[in-house]
Amino acid sequence: MQTQLKPLLLLTPLVLLSGCSTVSQIASIIAPDDDPTRPAREVAVADAVPKHEPLCKYGNMPSYKVLGKSYQPMRSAVGFSESGIASWYGPNFHGKPTSCMEEYDMYKMTAAHKTLPLPSYVEVTNVENNKKVVVRVNDRGPFHEGRIIDLSYSAAWKLD
């Protein structure tokens, strides 16, 4: 397992018609999976394009429990802000269902968050190099102490 730490990332969910709002978060990146070979196609992966979407049928339950800890997903991200660590997830989850019951693709611009409404759109800025990406939050996690968001492999790679 390879670990990469980055000093700071700024995460800002984008304001849309409903359910999303401005969110500020500070984070570092930790790589939980083996680092796959970086395919050339990743450079061309476009950021997620924010659009109004209904909440996912799955993943937005009033509460859920993982590893003995309870979480209450938000119905709206209005006024939300948080700081902490970001990690990325890749090959170990590639092709498996997300909390929205969509197939996880580590080469798309997606992310997982414990409580943001699914889906939400988040702008992530690496404040060390000012690189920014926009991701679509469609999964729950990370369920590791101190981590606030899991980025797809492509999202993390584009921020590096």
Where are the language model's segments positioned?
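Secreted/periplasmic proteins
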Residues: C20-D160
